[in-house]
């Protein structure tokens, strides 16, 4: 009854407001936005670029061509400047020798505050902002993504790859045509999900995975909007899709999954310690972990395959390297799936790794972001800069990745860019000085992706199988650009797709 009265009152008030009242409300809202951007540069602060749009600031310029726009600002204002972007003031530090200013100031520049706010907006996880102990315990679970635990994951992953490839793809003896992005997303999603979460044992697992993947991709498509300040109610059916995915991780559904990984089991144990049994926020945590596991791996796999398909010399070098490794370990490609490579053997494939790193260099827009907890002065060799409490400070690696002083012809794909004298190349220079950071697709410092080893091994394993067992040819041999829809978050989508064809080698 109270709800009906409230709703009726709301309608009555809106009607009474009329057009003049609505115009006044709109004017007041515009005034509030203008007051928000009335900020002026204080002495000691970096140059301030607010753009001409209230609240949005420079977002349209940045979305159009991020790298060119940032390089233009760098040329005009230097390596450090502050921009208004979607209601937030972000100070960008572009000099790679000043990155430590962001990385080392843990107390004043917080990743946790920023990430917890992001988790609440994107996945509806609220408790992490209040419970630091749970945050710390969940962080400890990442130990199961490295060392011996990673070896166990890789073994499980290989078994899952066999079950995906043997009954379906290995029967493709004549040419089959597919779009590259759906091909990559289908395989990566299934392999990742079954390796981490296990398989559903009481229903059609393939149908479950297919439906979950489709819902996940719809959710991920709106991720950039979710983490902005746009209300989720304005994003179509994203809220209902998110709720549907979260319910896939209810205690009832989890009981039907067999083959949990150590990292998933440990996270579930921590969550059950801090939440009541049926709390849907447990499922929200699992959705967040699923997003972190596949949202960047899928486009990385796409770009790695795309560049190998378009560059025959790269494909030939990687295939030759894989063949030599198989011969040296006494393994042969036969019927079924006899190939088995350890983590150390996968790490020895330097042409393959260099090709993946080069694809990441060209497609990664992963931005290291910190929340300023108190007014702070950043002191560097080139000067001191003041940043304000409540602002954000960021490192924008695409400027580093596209620097011709560091990478010759940075717009080109060169599969051997990270190889020197037959070994992994880890030494790069700028202004005659060695760089500590030269490739940053996984972030840096406290925000460095804890699942990077798992993701790289997954892509390496999958590429080894595809290049060993299949003939692969690109049909649409055309240049593909970046979509920029996930501007500051991870690996960018392609702005279009390409057709390729594949068949089992005779």
UniProtKB/Swiss-Prot annotation:
Membrane-topology annotation of the record: Multi-pass membrane protein
Activity regulation information from UniProt: Inhibited by drugs voriconazole and metyrapone.
GO CC terms of this entry: endoplasmic reticulum membrane
Keywords from the named record: Cholesterol metabolism, Disease variant, Endoplasmic reticulum, Heme, Hereditary spastic paraplegia, Intrahepatic cholestasis, Iron, Lipid biosynthesis, Lipid metabolism, Membrane, Metal-binding, Microsome, Monooxygenase, Neurodegeneration, Oxidoreductase, Steroid biosynthesis, Steroid metabolism, Sterol metabolism, Transmembrane, Transmembrane helix
Pathway recorded for this protein: Lipid metabolism; bile acid biosynthesis; Steroid hormone biosynthesis
Main EC class the enzyme belongs to: oxidoreductase
Compartments where found: Endoplasmic reticulum membrane; Microsome membrane
InterPro entries: CYP450_sterol_14alpha_dmase, Cyt_P450, Cyt_P450_CYP7A1-type, Cyt_P450_E_grp-IV, Cyt_P450_sf
Annotated transmembrane regions: 17-37, 289-309
Record EC number: 1.14.14.26, 1.14.14.29
Presence of the UniProt keyword Lipid metabolism in the record: yes
Resulting phenotype, residue 198 to R: In SPG5A; uncertain significance
UniProt: heme binding residues: 449
Tissue specificity as recorded in UniProt: Widely expressed. Expressed in brain, testis, ovary, prostate, liver, colon, kidney, small intestine, thymus and spleen.
Main subcellular location: endoplasmic reticulum
One function term, GO molecular function aspect: heme binding
GO biological process: B cell chemotaxis; bile acid biosynthetic process; cholesterol homeostasis; cholesterol metabolic process; epithelial cell proliferation; estrogen receptor signaling pathway; negative regulation of intracellular estrogen receptor signaling pathway; positive regulation of epithelial cell proliferation
Cofactor(s) the protein needs: heme
Function field: A cytochrome P450 monooxygenase involved in the metabolism of endogenous oxysterols and steroid hormones, including neurosteroids. Mechanistically, uses molecular oxygen inserting one oxygen atom into a substrate, and reducing the second into a water molecule, with two electrons provided by NADPH via cytochrome P450 reductase (CPR; NADPH-ferrihemoprotein reductase). Catalyzes the hydroxylation of carbon hydrogen bonds of steroids with a preference for 7-alpha position. Usually metabolizes steroids carrying a hydroxy group at position 3, functioning as a 3-hydroxy steroid 7-alpha hydroxylase.
UniProt similarity note: Belongs to the cytochrome P450 family.
Protein name from the UniProt record: Cytochrome P450 7B1
Organism encoding this protein: Homo sapiens
Gene (UniProt): CYP7B1
